[in-house]
């Protein structure tokens, strides 16, 4: 069924391109063919995209990134249409999502967006993004299925980050910022450039006490790059980053009442996870050579390491069976270690009306998980005691991936260019679990292999020197995780089953768009518009629903299966102007309709999902609070046709910049997000909000002949102190009272008005 679906979607998209392609071929007989180049690369973004790119793409260079003085990545990406990111914990925790894909999931799942840093595909255990903002040279967002270039998890697109490098990093720099809730930031940077080399070293630290109870965070990062010209045509560059991070709870509270009366969470003090200690290490060695003015070679080798420990699953009952809400009472200590190593190589060549690129991508990944009981606990008041220190799980996943990919771009006339991409991934996954009490002392050794093909077909046509239209169809995929494949091997629960026959999740993206450069009332503006649809068929769901209890035979036991379907469609609009009459403007608008197309097996748990399942509780049982603390039932829902939660139907970001005098910039931003559903059954709402953000910046050259420059800035987010929720997530009866309502929704209240100011001294 999946293959038929994929073929039908691709055929429909390509038929839609056939008419303009045929027209262009006829025109080519009488018109000079256009010279084209391949600008896509899975290694390096040195090739600027041009008007022959058949997808939506937004790029921020270093000056744009630095001008915003952003505290987190979403403050930059808000101006990108289609970004539906999860933002939590004073903005320190971000999961980037695009066009509503994967917004229904909110735990440690992958986000459906490939994150690539200097050619290194980065996957972090929690699915969050830990990118050092102080080390960013460039950010690029590619929307639509992008597995044709980046492979696994590029269901909705990719975010490509390029870190600082090159001669532009020469000189000395010192930054110091202060802000609300104990926010502090410092940066030291030193760089040098000669005729054949450029190098820099940088230290950055950020910390804050946090608005929420137990929400402190800190990050200390060393980074650097050495770039050396081997000769006139080749270059070698070594980049590294070493980061030690800590963050505590995300700031969530349970229920709308707590969000209103206790937004800091002082009376709760517990989220599902807390006490994250994260050590990240990344290095990459890149080589490039221009063979001639029409062809070049690129290669990179890399390693990325992530060592993370954290607490999860707050205890509901202590070892004596008494209810507990102590902030130290968590049941699980998680120790996660991963190492991602790989190498990529690309060759590209231009033959006037034809351009080709081919590459190979080799990866060796190791993921190790160990979970132990942090404290002694019971899951029900009279259940068995799990002693502290009990080894709950100890497993390792090894992945070996080999991929070949390529792109062909060819002119069909003076104004029309077609693009074709193909990629094949071969992946071998091996899963080993030690014999521990948590899995009944069973030793597990198993595995699975996958072969996945990804494609893109695109067309661009220049209507004039200032405007063009484009269309494309592309695919994205995500491999099943080890948990989804082999979960039944790691538990003693007979109702939890493995499914080694799972297929990779697939997505088909179709997009039609237009770009135009035009003068509006004196302002030179670039305008963009796109119409898109992303279809997912047979995506992976638990047979009991996304986050339902695993202790029931409803749904045939708890097993991950290819049984879900979803569709995201919408319109994206953006506009940016150059400065004119001391003003410049930006606008980004998104109109999104994201729905489940197949999801008839959703179950909402009422009561304690770790207790005993009762299919049809009596009236007396339903009225007894003690019953719900030790038992539960489920309510079935058919979510087919319902909106995917946390996907607002409308988003708007408007920015204005005023330049009243040389060196001065005053900025304002209106950030609007419509309301959406907080749960899959579309019962509880996440209200919308409109926020105003303000900023001022002044840069001046200091007296004397040193060439030193001083930059001062101040920024106020949520200037009117509007109270709203950063995120809202509902799934089951969190209070164990037999009712699912707004008091069960996990909510992160917004901290309100936040201010920051700082200075930067540069030599």
Over which residues does each language-model region extend?
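Membrane-embedded beta-barrel scaffold of Gram-negative outer-membrane proteins
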Residues: 188, 296-314, 462, 468-474, ...
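Surface-exposed extracellular loop regions of Gram-negative outer-membrane beta-barrel proteins
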Residues: 253, 366-368, 373, 380, ...
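Gram-negative outer-membrane beta-barrel transporters
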Residues: 411-418, 426-427, 524-535, 556-679, ...
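C-terminal beta-signal and adjacent terminal beta-strands/loops
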Residues: 477, 671, 675-677, 698-763
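N-terminal periplasmic "start-of-domain" segments of outer-membrane beta-barrel proteins
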Residues: 34-68, 94-97, 113
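Transmembrane beta-barrel wall of Gram-negative outer-membrane proteins
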Residues: 178-207, 212-251, 273-296, 352, ...
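Extracytoplasmic beta-strand/coil segments of soluble accessory domains associated
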Residues: 74-120
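Short acidic/polar hinge/loop motifs at secondary-structure boundaries
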Residues: 113, 118-144
